[in-house]
């Protein structure tokens, strides 16, 4: 690999076999190097191979407009998130999170603090992503010497959710709000307080994360087993009544009708979560 551009001692760009520019990172990778020099492969830590040409072009433009340190911070956060979540995030997050970190760094250096109105909801409903957000604050503190509040951990968690579910940020906000409303319906229907440390509660939240994704994508589970639905609605009549309230809420708010298959999964999860209250 030959250096095409040097951004700093740790970040360069190359041209691949298709003359497509890519970013390469590694400690000291460009030290005492110039354009056209060969890269020491042993120093390569990360090559940004972004398959989407539009995303790649925007990323290359972005890295020319922001401090390279913000790119390094974003990459470390994304790598940590993918390791913890055991998944590959949508590559668009390299754009959105890098840009957000640069914007946030400038804002806080100018004493412009912003609150996240969904902080409490994200802490409760998306703990794994929020904990990644907290780790991100530690990385930002170490690399950029900025002490950021938990509000920023929540915002970074939303970017992680965006990368997980491939949803736009307004949809992520709506997904969080819908999840909160569904939990309220269950809570007040059964007059209970959830055991938020129980495995059944965690599984319910995980189900709701992907249920709300399907809601906004319009990709519901299709009806395959009406007999099982009938059996479970009889076996768990109160959970069924609760799910009917959820169905009405979703129809009244978003105009979407839940399939019996979606209702079946909700009945099962609600029955489990109320058993561990």
Residue ranges and their predicted role:
Residues 1-277:
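A cross-family "folded-core" feature that marks the main globular domain of proteins
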């Amino acid at each position: 690999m030959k250096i095409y551009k040097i951004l700093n001692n740790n970040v360069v760009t190359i041209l691949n076999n298709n003359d497509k520019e890519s970013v390469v990172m590694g400690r000291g990778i460009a030290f005492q190097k110039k354009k056209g020099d060969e890269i020491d492969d042993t120093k390569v830590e990360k090559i940004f191979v972004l398959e989407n040409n539009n995303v790649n072009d925007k990323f290359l433009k972005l890295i020319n407009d922001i401090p390279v340190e913000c790119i390094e911070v974003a990459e470390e956060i994304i790598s940590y998130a993918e390791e913890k979540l055991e998944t590959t995030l949508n590559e668009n997050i390299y754009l959105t999170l890098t840009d957000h970190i640069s914007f946030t760094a400038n804002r806080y250096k100018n004493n412009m603090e912003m609150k996240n109105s969904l902080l409490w909801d994200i802490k409760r409903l998306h703990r794994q992503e929020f904990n990644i957000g907290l780790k991100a604050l530690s990385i930002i503190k170490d690399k950029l010497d900025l002490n950021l509040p938990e509000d920023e951990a929540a915002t970074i968690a939303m970017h992680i959710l965006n990368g997980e579910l491939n949803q736009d940020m307004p949809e992520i906000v709506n997904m969080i709000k819908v999840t909160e409303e569904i939990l309220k319906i269950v809570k007040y229907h059964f007059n209970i307080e959830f055991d938020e440390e129980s495995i059944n509660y965690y599984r319910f939240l995980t189900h709701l994360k992907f249920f709300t994704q399907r809601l906004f994508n319009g990709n519901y589970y299709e009806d395959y087993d009406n007999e099982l639905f009938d059996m479970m609605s009889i076996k768990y009549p109160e959970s069924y009544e609760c799910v009917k309230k959820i169905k009405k809420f979703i129809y009244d708010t978003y105009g979407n009708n839940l399939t019996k298959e979606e209702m079946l999964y909700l009945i099962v999860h609600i029955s489990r979560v109320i058993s561990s209250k």
